[in-house]
Every structure is written in structure tokens, then in C-alpha cells.
Amino acid sequence: MTRREGLAALLGESAKLAQGPVVGHTSTLRVDQLRAGSQQPRRQFGTEGLTELAASIQSQGILQPLLVRAVGDTYEIVAGERRWRAAQLAGLTEVPVIVKSLTDQEAAVIALIENLQRENLNLIDEVEGKLLLVANALGIASEQARSRLNELLRNPVPEDVETLSAVFLPLGRESWQSFAKNKVRILNYPPPLVEALRQGMALTMATLIARAPENKQADLIAKVQQGAGRKEIVAEVERLCHRPTVRLEKRVAQALGNQKWLDRLDPQDAEAMQHWLSQMPRALQQEIGDN
């Protein structure tokens, strides 16, 4: 079996486990015997959503067991961390679980697919989770995943390309190439913008704000959080990006139109000015020539 075939089989089985319900022997574990999964892509759990889930658990119990794996003398949650957290809010001391023997790679695939299919991840958690999956699939350190994707875009290695295609197949319509080109770069955004994306800001809005001067981005983020629409943000970004250029053009025009200033130039500066004017853009030459 090739690496691609083996990975495809793993992804298919992991997708079944993630989509649930999980089939297997159900047992019960104390909540303090469990710990959050190391392969969990979700960094934040909304307080309001957890409170609602806790209320549901209080009235109906936990309808689907958590999927866990043994790690030393504890159990790591692979799928169901929200249920575990909500169960503690609800005052439960035990939760139903199904224990599976899973590798790090299997656990990462299951955790990511479960989160992508059950409840939308914020964009930063999605990107970081997929990078973790890429690292596991290619057998590299997680911090190398971004640079490796960029390398493969420039110089594709057939086996790695096949592996990545198999990785992204069960995750939706997005290809690994699209992910590498369009989403990975957001991790390089300034920290306030990354945090805004983590809090749920749309990528289209964040991409707009990223075009603005960095010292103005916090104000734009605040405007979006206060309800500003795309049209308003586009106009504000355009104003911030083009205002300095317009001001410079006006100042240049004013200086060139100031005959007294031109007359005060010494011969060396006057010669430099003539040289600079001889290299003016063609559009400006045509405008001057027409007048």
C-alpha cells in the first residue's frame, strides 16, 4: 500500500469516527480523568454556547459519548471537548466515553474533521488546525508546515502533492493549493488582526483592513465590531491608503508652480530639477504638452 492509499484509508475511517455516532463499548470516566486533546484545533469555546449546552445536558444528559484515547494514566479527548467542558458547567462528575487506540495523526484528523463538520471554527483555528494536519501527514514539525507548503507550490513533489490532496479531500471543497495561497498568509497579519479573525471576523473584511496602514488597523477593527459594513470599510481603507499620495502630489504641484521658489534654486539644484523633470511619467508629459 502506498503512502497515499494508506492515508486515504486513514482519512476515510477518521471521517466516519468524526461524523459519529461513534460505535464501540461505552464506559464512564470521571471528568478529572480527562484532559483536553493535544490535537484539538479549537482554541476558544464561546461562553454563551457552552452555557446553552450545559443547560441541555442538565435536562437530557450527554446524548453522544466522548471519543477518547488513553495517554499514560489519563485519557485525552479526541472528539467531544465542548461536551466535557459543558458537563463540568452542568455539575456532572462523570461522562460517557468510548476509548479508542489512536495515533497522533488519527487523533488530529478526527478532531479537525469533527470541528469542521459539527460547528464552524474561527478562521485562525481552522488554519492552524489544517497546518497541524499537514505536518502530521508529511511527517514534519508543525512549525515547518507553512514553509513546506510554499516550497511545494513552487516545486511540486508528486508524492507529497498526492498526500496533501488526500488530506484535504474529506475537509470540503478547498484544495491544499488554495489553502496555501489564500489562507496561510493570514497568520502573518499583525496580532490585533489575527485576534479579530480568531474572534470571528470574516476573511474578506480582514483582507481589506490588512491593506491599511498598520497603525490605523485597530480603529478599522473597532468599526467592524461596532457594525460597520463592507462599503464603509472599503471607503475608509481607500482614504487611508491614498491620502498621503494625493497630498504629496499637491505639494509637488504647488512647488513647481511657485516661480519665486524656482528662481531661488542654485545652478546645481536647477540642473537636478531639469534632470528629474526629463524623467517624468508619460501621462504627465502628455498633459503638459496638450497645454
From Swiss-Prot:
InterPro entries in the cross-refs: Chromosome_partition/occlusion (IPR050336), ParB/RepB/Spo0J (IPR004437), ParB/Sulfiredoxin_dom (IPR003115), ParB/Sulfiredoxin_sf (IPR036086)
* SUPFAM superfamilies noted in UniProt: KorB DNA-binding domain-like, ParB/Sulfiredoxin
Which residues form each disulfide bond in the chain? none
Bilayer-crossing regions: none
| Swiss-Prot/TrEMBL keywords | Chromosome partition, DNA-binding, Plasmid
Q: Output the GO biological process annotations, alphabetical, semicolon-separated.
A: chromosome segregation
Query: Which Gene Ontology cellular component terms are annotated?
Result: chromosome
Q: Which GO terms describe its molecular function?
A: DNA binding
Give the signal peptide range. none
Q: Answer yes or no on keyword DNA-binding.
A: yes
Instruction: Identify one Pfam family in the record.
Output: ParBc
Concerning CDD domains, the annotation shows: SPO0J_N
Can you tell me which family this protein belongs to?
Belongs to the ParB family.
What this protein is called in its record is Probable plasmid-partitioning protein ParB
